[in-house]
Amino acid sequence: RAMSFYQSLAAWEYVTEHATDFAWGGGTQDYVLALKEGEAGAGIVTPPPDMSTGWVAYVEVDDVDATAALAETLAGQVLRPPFDVPGVGRNALLRDPNGATIGVAMSRHNFPVTRRQFGNEVYLSADRSFPRDFYARLFDWEFSKPQVDENHSRNKIAVQGQIVAATWDDSPLDNLASRWLPTIKVIDPLGSLRSVPDLGGVKLGQMSDAHVPQDLLFLEDADGELVCLTGA
């Protein structure tokens, strides 16, 4: 259902790849790359039984194995040790001290960095905390000074001066565990949000902030997974 949902919502196209030793569970299995305008910023796989479903944000690193080892010294966890994905690269799955899942990758493909398919990642925290030291030491990220608006705090995250993500210490959703969410770019965010119920999803709410140029629109897709929209 997710493939049809995002094809209609965000004009994604798909390419199916075949693995003889599938990295997410072994054996022979197909996996899907999601493309838009030549960018392949997402993949769709069926996770093994011991893993939950949902979006996983990935950070590009020079050495996946070293990064995974470092995470464990910074109060993080390795959920899935480093593994190779044929035609894609080497990955690992980590959990930060707040419990949010984050992937690390060293890519070995020719697709360009996604700029039209996705916006900046967003970190949502239900308890108004963000493991800043963990991410600063793990990825050498830079953080802006907190931007406070109506008692809510935001931080921008940069790599070599380029904004790549943001933290929000509140959300329009109740009882939400800390997590990274992608922001999918669409031409008409409000129009796309109105179409969500017809596509089998659920509209949840939005966040506005004087420091953020566009609202973030939150929804559940046709499989019940959280995601947000922003303008292209």
Q: Where are each of the predicted segments found?
A:
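Surface-exposed beta-strand edges and flanking loops
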Residues: 16, 46, 167-169
